[in-house]
Amino acid sequence: MAVYTEVSDAALAEFLSAYAIGSLLSFKGIAEGVENSNFFLHTTEGAYILTLYEKRVREQDLPFFIGLMEHLSARGLACPQPVRDRAGQALGQLCGRPAAIVSFLEGVSVKAPGAEHCRELGRALAELHAAGRDFPMVRENNLSVSAWRPLFAQAEAQADSVEPGLAARTRSDLAVLEAHWPRDLPGGVIHADLFTDNVFFIGDALSGLIDFYFACTDAFAYDLAVCLNAWCFDPDGTFHRDMAAALIAGYEAVRPLEAAEVAALPILCRGAALRFMLTRLVDWLNVPPGALVKPKDPREFDRRLTFHRQARDARDYGRPH
């Protein structure tokens, strides 16, 4: 979550007049994250999140995201519930951007997760996959393997200024991943961005999942690979096998992996790491001037890739055969 578009008091008041959510008490921008402009809203009726969708989010995808959150919430998954206005619409316009209000989830993200947090996450991820099985809409993953080379083209000339040798390593990774990317794995709705700041806990109990704006239709095991990258490494590239084992075990307690998914885990983890390295690299080199935003370091995923290149099978990620 971040702020790219500033919202005036007058514009906000006009926008909120369409909603039956009480009178505004306070309004504050959220500086975390990288995709949209997000604000805390506190009203006489409760707490909400207001999101203005910025340019990387395609407007035609918004009905998928809004519909998915409503679908998952209706099936008992703890996620933001879109708030519809008095006319029954979940999407509006604010400051020239598409905008929506969703319910506020209680809990906090965990900055230094342990194995039990990872086990909880694995279980919640499998429950998300199960809850989304009958969701009727489809959205292609537009940040999967076919998108990585075009992304790299935007940053290739400057890559080595961020980290020496990064361009050559990325070219090698792309060649391997494009040749060996698995097809036809079990799939459906995935979150695709379940980093620690998108998962809330109250104590050690998982209380909610947020930020569904990369959700798409893809392989379930790829979503697991994203989580392994996001939760089980330190910024210096140190891998925590106990956390990975707990994450996978939590997932398989709800949905056991098929043999093809287990076999594909190393290549999926390598691809997931490259995907986040590339989007971070492009963002690192193109931060809008004056934006209230914290660009994330692509080198963290370059370090993770060192581990993934050496991984032989799922045992290296803590899953016993």
Curated annotation (Swiss-Prot):
InterPro entries membership: Aminoglycoside_PTrfase, Homoserine_kinase_II, Kinase-like_dom_sf, Pseudomonas-type_ThrB
Record-annotated disulphide pairs: none
Broad class of enzyme this protein falls into: transferase
Highest taxon of source: Bacteria
EC number: 2.7.1.39
One annotated GO biological process: threonine biosynthetic process
Molecular function GO terms recorded: ATP binding; homoserine kinase activity
Entry keyword set: Amino-acid biosynthesis, ATP-binding, Kinase, Nucleotide-binding, Threonine biosynthesis, Transferase
Signal peptide: none
Pathway linked to the protein: Amino-acid biosynthesis; L-threonine biosynthesis; L-threonine from L-aspartate: step 4/5
Enzymatic reactions: L-homoserine + ATP = O-phospho-L-homoserine + ADP + H(+)
Entry similarity comment: Belongs to the pseudomonas-type ThrB family.
PANTHER family xref list: AMINOGLYCOSIDE PHOSPHOTRANSFERASE DOMAIN-CONTAINING PROTEIN, AMINOGLYCOSIDE PHOSPHOTRANSFERASE DOMAIN-CONTAINING PROTEIN-RELATED
Protein's name according to its UniProt entry: Homoserine kinase
